[in-house]
């Protein structure tokens, strides 16, 4: 069987351990009004049978607002993980970890729902999501 032709130069992305499983409660780090989010799905994540799909820094996931205003609650939103407690090893050997697991809400068009992000944002998330990087006050 012949090998398929490459689709151009592929950028090297280091592996980040996926540590935020479906069902996890995470902090909402933007000013959309939501306080606590619950991860309900990680799209495009393939896993073994009976194993929960998990997300890591920079991943898109579907969430439900658990704590916040009534108009935001009990609806499915998209979110991007911007911080995780588990250490992320970078190519230069540095390990970066944060004090909480946090995400920002994303509209279907890819814009952030809030206009400000509280706290630092991991560099892995800002590389994948430039709209998130624009609102970040601090990128670590």
UniProtKB/Swiss-Prot annotation:
Pfam family, one: Ribosomal_L14
GO biological process, one term: translation
GO cellular component terms, semicolon-separated: cytosolic large ribosomal subunit
GO molecular function list: large ribosomal subunit rRNA binding; structural constituent of ribosome
Keywords recorded for this protein, A-Z: Ribonucleoprotein, Ribosomal protein, RNA-binding, rRNA-binding
CDD domains: Ribosomal_uL14 (cd00337)
InterPro entries registered for this protein in UniProt: Ribosomal_uL14, Ribosomal_uL14_CS, Ribosomal_uL14_sf
Xref: HAMAP family: Ribosomal_uL14
Subunit field text: Part of the 50S ribosomal subunit. Forms a cluster with proteins L3 and L24e, part of which may contact the 16S rRNA in 2 intersubunit bridges.
Protein function: Binds to 23S rRNA. Forms part of two intersubunit bridges in the 70S ribosome.
Family designation: Belongs to the universal ribosomal protein uL14 family.
PANTHER family for the chain: 50S/60S RIBOSOMAL PROTEIN L14/L23, LARGE RIBOSOMAL SUBUNIT PROTEIN UL14
Protein name per the record: Large ribosomal subunit protein uL14
Gene: rpl14
